[in-house]
A protein has these predicted regions:
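Short amphipathic alpha-helix that is part of the acyltransferase structural core
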Residues: 1-32, 46-51
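Small/polar loops that bind or transfer phosphate-bearing groups
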Residues: 8, 71, 107-108
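Short alpha-helical
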Residues: 11, 65, 110-114
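A conserved beta-strand-loop-helix scaffold within acyl/acetyltransferase catalytic domains
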Residues: 32-51, 55-74
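Conserved acetyl-CoA pyrophosphate-binding loop and the N-cap/start of the following alpha-helix
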Residues: 79, 83-91
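Conserved active-site alpha-helix within GNAT-family acetyltransferase domains
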Residues: 86, 98, 102-103, 109-132
Length: 132
C-alpha cells in the first residue's frame, strides 16, 4: 500500500467528515474542517492512498510557542495495521519541530496506550485534566 503524507495538506471537508465519522463511530457531520484548521491549528497531516483518497489524518494544535498537541488521529479501517497512524504522528512531530516547537503532547483513551507509547514513542508524564 503506497501512502503519501502531507503537512498542511489540502483539506476536503466532505472526505474528512466521512473519515472522522468512520474512525470515531458517529454520523457524518458537516464540520468546516478547512476553516477550523487554518484558524486554530499549527498544522495537520493528511495521508492519501495511491488513488488520492484520504486514509488518515491528524490535527496539531499549539500554544503559539513551544508546545504542540495531537488531536483527532484517525486512520480508515482499510488502511489500519499498516503503520499509517505511526507515520502520521512522525510527520506531525516533524512539522511541529520544524515550526519551532519543543514538545508534542497527546492524551488518549487507555486502549490506545500501546499505539502512542510503543508505536509512536510518546512517554508517560504527569498531567492534569478538568472535565468541562
Amino acid at each position: 500500500m503506497t501512502i503519501t503524507y502531507e503537512w498542511r495538506g489540502d483539506v476536503d471537508n466532505s472526505a474528512l467528515n466521512e473519515l472522522h465519522a468512520e474512525g470515531f463511530g458517529h454520523p457524518v457531520g458537516r464540520t468546516d474542517w478547512e476553516t477550523r484548521l487554518r484558524r486554530h491549528s499549527l498544522g495537520w497531516v493528511c495521508a492519501r492512498d495511491a488513488r488520492g483518497r484520504l486514509v488518515g489524518f491528524v490535527n496539531v494544535a499549539w500554544d503559539g510557542g513551544a508546545h504542540a498537541f495531537v488531536l483527532d488521529t484517525v486512520v480508515a479501517r482499510a488502511a489500519r495495521s499498516n503503520g499509517v497512524g505511526a507515520a502520521l504522528i512522525r510527520a506531525a512531530a516533524k512539522g511541529s519541530r520544524d515550526a519551532g516547537c519543543a514538545w508534542l503532547h497527546v492524551d488518549f483513551e487507555e486502549r490506545l496506550r500501546p499505539f502512542y507509547f510503543d508505536a509512536c514513542g510518546f512517554r508517560e508524564t504527569a498531567a492534569g485534566l478538568i472535565a468541562l
